[in-house]
Regions:
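Hydrophobic core residues within well-ordered beta-strands of beta-rich domains
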Residues: 45-47, 86, 102, 117
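Short, hydrophobic beta-strand segments
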Residues: 88-96
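Terminal connector regions
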Residues: 98-127
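Beta-sheet-dominated interaction scaffolds and their linkers
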Residues: 21-48, 54, 125-129
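Surface-exposed binding patches on compact interaction domains or structured appendages
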Residues: 56-87
Length: 129
């Protein structure tokens, strides 16, 4: 009787593990964007990072935080279903900043298997003449 009970419990445990959904998983097309060289006369530049939910559960972006107040990320707020795409638009505002090379990071936190991903933007703002 005990053997039947143990076998039944193992069967149910095995079925529940097999039926469990795999978590969401974010996959970006690229992790870095280089703006190249731009003048401080036009100090605001933007780019978009595209991603896909390659997992089997809905993906939610909980937070996207820039390393500096001069960089602003805007992201998809609704859950991204498996196989669907989303985007994070990043704007760098160099107004009042010293000309030269910059590199900033955007930390993206999700409900995915990998909870944190770091994106980077860089470029060189030249002095206005």
């Amino acid at each position: 009787m005990k053997k039947i009970l143990v076998l039944t419990m193992l069967l149910f445990c095995g079925m529940s593990v097999a039926m469990a959904q795999k978590p969401a998983e974010i996959k970006f097309d690229k992790l870095t964007h280089d703006f190249g060289t731009f003048s401080e006369k036009a100090p605001v530049v933007s780019c978009t990072f595209y991603f896909t939910n390659v997992g089997e559960s809905p993906l939610v972006i909980n937070q996207a935080v820039a390393s500096c107040g001069c960089t602003v990320p805007e992201y998809t707020k609704t859950p991204i279903q498996p196989g669907e795409k989303g985007e994070i638009k990043v704007t760098y505002n160099g107004t009042g900043k010293f000309p030269g090379h910059f590199k900033k990071s955007i930390t993206v936190r999700t409900n995915g298997a990998v909870e944190m991903t770091r994106l980077y933007i860089e470029g060189e703002m030249t002095e206005a003449k």
